[in-house]
């Protein structure tokens, strides 16, 4: 860094040069304040009743050696977790959720425990036709409809993701005049009129797109969850998050964007302190915690536990964590208590 550069020069949406210098200090680990005295068991025990509404696994069309969805579901059951909702970038996960649930029921009886509830959904990438109302209707019918809980807007094929990665244009939910495309309105209408409650996640959209989506979702009475608002690609400022909360959206903060993924994305600079700031300034009432794990080397139940443990040791109360891991995702997904 050249001399005279302002400490407040941004190296990300909110991260400054000063922030980077602090965490790059050679004595950084030895200068941190003492942790609150919570053990790993304290964090693990808090998984009981928790919901992880955004996680990944195998089988998948992208990234080898992801954790098995079935094995993750077993680990969640052993921890007493209430529900999981698996996401894949390429295919509808609701049918797989049904198959996993049936297998899990038999296994849980043998173990003498209660199985976690397993759900899925669909992500509107090119593999399912993009912003495709037919894919949404398919998710909501048939003998796997009850396992559909989340509809994700485009992720790896979104305009934001593709342009950020230097891959050219991608899918946008806005037309050339900056208004929501008709097919997006149709999709929200399908969701709002369905017998099965489904939450919509913003996924990898520009903030401008999310704001327009939130306005329309509110009109239709559709539950909107703003996906990994602590990840640099889709990061929200405190002010943006407040604006979306005012439109009745939930703000999702995820473990991998707080803690990093050393195998799948070594060296990834994450927004740990911005995650803490969002929790502190917004409060827990409209925040949902999730793992977003399931990448190579990132087991979802383990990552969720580590996120909880980290928050406990940094002063976030058990009551606030329970709100963000149990009560809020239950409300967003309309799960029975």
What is each residue range found by the language model?
Residues 2-116:
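An N-terminally biased module of ancient metal coordination in phosphate/nucleic-acid-related enzymes
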Residues 50-68, 120-130, 172-178:
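Active-site mouth loops of central-metabolism enzymes
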Residues 52, 71-95, 114-127, 148-158, ...:
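Divalent metal-dependent hydrolysis catalytic cores, especially in the metallo-beta-lactamase
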Residues 61-66, 94-98, 210-216, 235-241, ...:
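Histidine/acidic-residue-rich catalytic or RNA/ligand-binding cores of hydrolases
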Residues 125-227:
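Extended substrate/RNA-proximal surfaces in nucleic-acid metabolism proteins
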Residues 202-270:
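Catalytic pocket-lining loop regions of alpha/beta-barrel enzymes
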Residues 254, 284-301:
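Short acidic/histidine-rich active-site segments
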Residues 302-337:
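Mid-to-C-terminal alpha-helical segments outside catalytic/metal-binding sites
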């Amino acid at each position: 860094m050249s001399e005279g550069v302002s400490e407040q020069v941004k190296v990300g949406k909110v991260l400054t040069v000063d922030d980077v210098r602090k965490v790059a200090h050679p004595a950084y680990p030895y200068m941190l304040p003492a942790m609150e005295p919570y053990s790993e068991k304290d964090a693990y025990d808090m998984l009981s009743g928790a919901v992880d509404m955004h996680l990944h696994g195998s089988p998948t069309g992208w990234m080898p050696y992801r954790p098995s969805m079935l094995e993750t579901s077993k680990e969640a059951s052993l921890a007493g977790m209430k529900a999981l909702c698996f996401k894949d970038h390429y295919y509808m996960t609701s049918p797989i959720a049904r198959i996993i649930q049936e297998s899990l029921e038999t296994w849980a009886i043998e173990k003498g425990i209660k199985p976690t509830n397993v759900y899925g959904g669909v992500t509107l990438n090119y593999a399912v036709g993009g912003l495709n109302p037919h894919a949404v209707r398919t998710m909501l019918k048939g003998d796997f409809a009850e396992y559909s809980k989340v509809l994700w807007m485009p992720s790896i094929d979104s305009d934001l993701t593709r342009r950020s990665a230097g891959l050219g244009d991608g899918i946008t939910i806005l037309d050339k005049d900056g208004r929501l495309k008709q097919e997006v309105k149709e999709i929200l209408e399908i969701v709002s009129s369905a017998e099965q409650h489904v939450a919509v996640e913003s996924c990898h959209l520009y903030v401008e797109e999310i704001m327009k989506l939130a306005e329309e979702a509110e009109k239709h009475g559709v539950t909107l969850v703003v996906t990994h608002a602590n990840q640099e690609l889709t990061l929200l400022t405190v002010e943006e998050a407040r604006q979306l909360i005012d439109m009745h959206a939930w703000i999702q903060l995820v473990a991998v964007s707080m803690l990093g993924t050393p195998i799948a994305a070594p060296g990834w600079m994450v927004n740990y302190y911005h995650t803490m700031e969002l929790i502190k300034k917004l409060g827990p009432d409209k925040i949902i915690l999730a793992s977003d794990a399931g990448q190579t080397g990132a087991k979802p139940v383990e990552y969720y536990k580590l996120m909880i443990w980290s928050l406990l040791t940094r002063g976030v109360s058990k009551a606030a964590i329970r709100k963000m891991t149990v009560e809020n995702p239950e409300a967003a997904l309309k799960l029975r208590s």
